[in-house]
Curated annotation (Swiss-Prot):
Protein name, as recorded: Prefoldin subunit 5
NCBIfam families: prefoldin subunit alpha
In-chain residues carrying the UniProt-annotated modification Phosphoserine: 56
Statement: the UniProt record of this protein carries the keyword ATP-binding: no
Length: 154
């Protein structure tokens, strides 16, 4: 369990170190959420593409991607089955309905993961804000102390 730190007892360099650590944690959590959103978007797009697979589109011509910028002409001859990339180079054949369920489960899982990370991110933001406010107070105190000492010497 993480230990509790009273930030009022920390000096300016310690507060700076704590702020830097919180910056790194906020960056990590933000990056994690962004990556999860990218993957989730891919699953949403894949699920939406399954709506094109219906009997009225069977036999229609289409462009099949060979790379991200190269396509070959093809015909849609099976609207009942699809191959799904399940990771690490493995593909599974599923019916269009099973594929929709698969993508829905993936989307829901990623949504739950983002919902778990979001509170931690908000907590780190709040902690960082508190540290920055304390740093500002300490700097003001040091400035006032320096001004008082300068006035006393004069």
């Amino acid at each position: 369990m993480a230990q509790s730190i009273n930030i009022t007892e920390l000096n300016l360099p310690q507060l700076e170190m704590l702020k830097n650590q919180l910056d790194q944690e906020v960056e990590f959590l933000s990056t994690s959420i962004a990556q999860l959103k990218v993957v989730q978007t891919k699953y949403v797009e894949a699920k939406d593409c399954l709506n094109v697979l219906n009997k009225s589109n069977e036999g229609k011509e289409l462009l099949v991607p060979l790379t991200s910028s190269m396509y070959v002409p093809g015909k849609l001859h099976d609207v009942e089955h699809v191959l799904i990339d399940v990771g690490t180079g493995y593909y599974v054949e599923k019916t269009a309905e099973d594929a929709k369920d698969f993508f829905k489960r993936k989307i829901d899982f990623l949504t739950k993961q983002m919902e778990k990370i979001q509170p931690a991110l908000q907590e780190k933001h709040a902690m960082k804000q508190a540290v920055m406010e304390m740093m500002s107070q300490k700097i003001q105190q040091l400035t006032a102390l320096g001004a008082a000492q300068a006035t006393a010497k004069a």
